[in-house]
Amino acid sequence: MMNGVSIGLLVVAALVPTLVQAQQPTPLPELSYNYAELSYDEGDFELEGSDGIDGDGLTLSGSFELTEDWHAYASYSNSDLDSSIDVDTWALGAGYRYPLQDNVDIYGRVLYINREVDGPGRFAAEADDDGLGLQARIRMRVSEVFEVEGGIQHLDVGDSDTALQASARYHFTRNFSAGIGMTFAGDTDSFGINARYTF
C-alpha cells in the first residue's frame, strides 16, 4: 500500500510537465505580408507656388507574399486638398524582407507611382506625373497583440521628397488589426488611422 509520501511524489511527477510547459513563453505570431488595408489620413501639404494647405484622403492597399521573402504591393489613394485640389495616386511594386530574428524584419520596396492632380489654375496643367519610390523599414512584433514599424521613404514623382515614417498596430485577432501612423517629410506632415485584414 502506498503511503502519503509515495502519493505526493506521484502527484509532483504528474504536475512537473504541466508546470514546465506553462513557464515556456508562447511563440509570437509570425509577421505576415498577406493583407488588405484601408486607411484614412489627414495632414498639411506644401505644393510649389502655394502656402501650406490642409487635406485628407483614403488609401486602399494590399500586399501578397510571392515567396517566403518576396512580396508584391499595390495601393490607390484619393486625397482632397482645400482650394479644390483632387489628387489620385497609384503605386505598384515589389518588396523583399530580411528577418533579423524571430518577429523582427527589415524590408525594402521599389514602387512605380502615378499621380494625377486635378485643380484650378496652375494645378490643372500638372495633371499627370510618373515616378519611382523607395522604402526601407524595420518591422517588429513586440507582443502577442502589439506591433511597431518605422523607416524611411523616398519618392521621385514630379518633385523629389524623402520622409520618415512610424506606426503602431494592435491585433484584435489573428486576422484583424488597427493601426496609427505618422509621416514627416519636407513638404508633407500627416497622421493616419487604418484597419487591416491579414490572410
Question: What is each residue range found by the language model?
Answer:
Residues 40-46, 66-68, 76-82, 98, ...:
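Transmembrane beta-strands of outer-membrane beta-barrel pores
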Residues 34, 68-74, 101-106, 140-150, ...:
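Repeated loop/turn-to-beta-strand initiation elements of outer-membrane beta-barrel proteins
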Residues 1-32:
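Cleavable N-terminal export/targeting peptides
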